[in-house]
């Protein structure tokens, strides 16, 4: 199963769609919309798993993620632009720049203490950078894990962003090969 998933993500990444700035911004907006739409579901899951109140859930998890998505969307064009750097004299008349490139596919393992925030924050970075991602929520927060699974699967295609559930045994099989 995991080899098929990683192969599908590799093929999707190689199409080059994830490198497009407009695509990345659109995907971040889709994530924000899904988080807003499922805010109550996430609050209930956090209450069941960790005993968090609705206020605490929003302040430390959901609202935090939504604010970071907004900030990322506002700054992504600037962050993605090539950065000019000094060219050594012996390379004159050449010009040098740093061009940021996506890695390919990212594995994000979620902890139990802030299960939404610490799963979604790296996902925001992965999407912004132009990567595909596999999310593995903590098995110690089963309600949040189920909610995140549903959010991811209803929002993204599996060959782009996937979410897998299960215990420690499942993530030992989730080693991702380097796409490049």
Segments the model singles out, each with a brief description of its role:
Residues 1-97:
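N-terminal Rossmann-like NAD(P)+-binding subdomain of aldehyde/semialdehyde dehydrogenases
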Residues 89-174, 180:
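Rossmann-like NAD(P) dinucleotide-binding subdomain of oxidoreductase/dehydrogenase enzymes
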């Amino acid at each position: 199963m995991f080899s098929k998933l990683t192969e599908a993500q590799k093929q999707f990444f190689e199409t080059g769609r994830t490198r497009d700035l407009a695509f990345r911004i659109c995907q971040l907006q889709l994530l924000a919309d899904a988080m807003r739409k499922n805010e109550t579901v996430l609050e209930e899951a956090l209450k069941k798993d960790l005993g968090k109140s609705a206020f605490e859930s929003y302040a430390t998890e959901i609202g935090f993620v939504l604010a970071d998505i907004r900030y990322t969307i506002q700054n992504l064009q600037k962050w993605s632009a090539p950065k000019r750097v000094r060219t050594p004299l012996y390379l004159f008349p050449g010009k040098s720049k740093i061009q940021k490139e996506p890695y390919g596919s990212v594995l994000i393992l979620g902890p139990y203490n802030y299960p939404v925030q610490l799963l979604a924050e790296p996902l925001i970075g992965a999407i912004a950078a132009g990567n595909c991602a596999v999310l593995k929520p903590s098995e110690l927060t089963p309600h949040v894990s189920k909610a995140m699974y549903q959010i991811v699967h209803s929002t993204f295609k599996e060959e782009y962003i996937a979410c897998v559930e299960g215990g420690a045994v499942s993530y030992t099989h989730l080693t991702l090969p380097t796409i490049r």
